[in-house]
Amino acid sequence: VVEGGHIKVGQEVTCILPKADRPYTAAVITLSDKGAAGEREDKSGPAIVEMLKSAGYDIKETLLLADEQFLLEKELMRLSDQRQVNVIFTTGGTGFSERDRTPEATIAVCDRMANGIAEAIRNYSMTITPRAMFSRAVSGIRKKTLIINLPGSPKAVKESLDFLLPNLEHGLGILRESEGECARK
């Protein structure tokens, strides 16, 4: 129903069918102490949003947080439990700095890990730069929400999503129980 009212005999009715289980919903969280303090512009979060919108995703929320594990855990739980988004992308906080706690927060809230996603992104990124070996990014599942840690740089975010997005909908479809087997056709 697009708008309320009554249908009269003889009135033309148009049926608008939703795309099959689309659009997928997403949230994007940027982790950056300097960004949260207003000392640095967030370019990675908006880059993720732009790429997801271009791919047909419905962006439900974007956040910019300081590198605080408890804050990230709280937001990951809220976005998956209350907002029930299909996928949450984080950017930043995956390196070796003492304040980089994104993987720990993700692991703390996930019911199951999706190690293959982070491994595949890291493996692909290694073909671009050997510094990808320093990523501690992880991916996991909380209830029906997939959580994916991405790097903090806009360039690395774009490279990661160029690699990931063509196959991501299959995994999201399995989580939403609208797709089944992983076997190739």
What are these regions (language model features)?
Residues 22-67:
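Glycine-rich phosphate/diphosphate-binding loop of Rossmann-like nucleotide-binding domains
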Residues 19-21, 81, 138-142:
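Solvent-exposed alpha-helices and their adjacent loops that cap or buttress functional pockets
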Residues 29-30, 90-91, 149-151:
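Short beta-strand segments
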Residues 53-90, 95-110:
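N-terminal small/polar loop signature for handling phosphorylated ligands or for N-terminal nucleophile
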Residues 1-21:
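Metal-cofactor-dependent catalytic cores
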Residues 102-185:
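Proline/glycine-rich low-complexity loops and linkers
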Residues 19-26, 51, 176-185:
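SAM-dependent methyltransferases
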